[in-house]
Amino acid sequence: MIEVKNLSKSYGSKLAVDGISFTAGESEILGFLGPNGAGKSTTMNMLTGYLSSSGGQALINGVDILEDPVRAKKDIGYLPEQPPLYLDMTVMEYLNFVYDLKKCKLPRKSHLAEICSLVKITDVSRRVIRNLSKGYKQRVGLAQALVGNPKVLILDEPTVGLDPKQIIEIRTPVSYTHLRAHETLR
């Protein structure tokens, strides 16, 4: 699903990512560990096409993210460290917007309802995002990443700033998504 070969990123003379290589297969969960400034977020931004690399290659399902970003991004669900939320929209307005943006072909109403149920935001789906707690905003961010059933899910610090209960509530849908993908392969 993901194949990274000698991926690097420089900012002037500062090397942020130095020739990282790895592969991640279907239904595999990987994590990047390291101190602040180690290049974890930079690597994820390169994998998702939000940042170009200085060298190397990143393939998403065999498609080079730099050579054909539109095709590669169709298979990616991404939750950046700061969720890209439109605070003046309701949760459902926002998810419908993301659905349209991703040109999702799944049945709209049932697909979005399933995602809301999975990340436990059904009860706040009519509320304006600005008025939600940090935990709910994070769940909405995860929901937008799940729209379209992406084959690759990239989450950048999805639990930062959450309390222990909220962390468990975020991890549960991620694990469920992983298991569901694994069951599909059987």
Segments and roles (model prediction):
Residues 153-157, 162:
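Catalytic Walker B motif of ABC-type/P-loop ATPase nucleotide-binding domains
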